[in-house]
Amino acid sequence: MVKDGAVVDRGVNLAAEYCERLDLAILVSGLGLEVAALVFDMVASGKALHIWSMGDLLHDAIAFLKVCLLDGIVPLLDMDAECELAQVIFNTGLPLHNRLRTLLESALAATNSVPAITAQHALCEEDIVPLVYASMSVMFCSTTLLSNGVDSNLFESIRRSSQALLRSVFELHADQRTWILEEILASLVKLPAQKRAQSVHRVAGGKSV
């Protein structure tokens, strides 16, 4: 019993340490997304034109948005609800959930700011590629974690914003359309059968993919 008790205590300590690190990672990512959204707004409004390194700032902001979505938020939300890490997150209660909600709000602000840039500035391929993959990762995210207490409506807003961003890139960059379509179709094929049903993925005009 003493041994079992020690194992339980160690598990509790590891869970607490994991949540502390996750909380810090979410906090830092949220701050980074706020900075990225600020850069996008400055570029869209023309306020950053006097900054000699505007191109580098924009590139770094796009790269950070891609990393946060593709390598951070989406894998976290796609986590199997039955896995141990997901259970740890569920059991932490409001503090971590509120932090995650704030992160999603920052991600929404950032994704909402990008289409204005794509409409006004000719982006290079180095910036288009991460934007496309970031948008697609959100579009095809299963959001398993959100169905267990975290605000799913907020992520749906991010999904719609990402679809608008991808549509903007697709319309404005004809030379990129072929590979974008190939990646979208490849992602659709990989989806479970129930998620390939009509009405799940819609395009402009109300038609289904």
PLM features per residue range, with description:
Residues M1-V209:
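Eukaryotic alpha-helical solenoid repeat scaffolds
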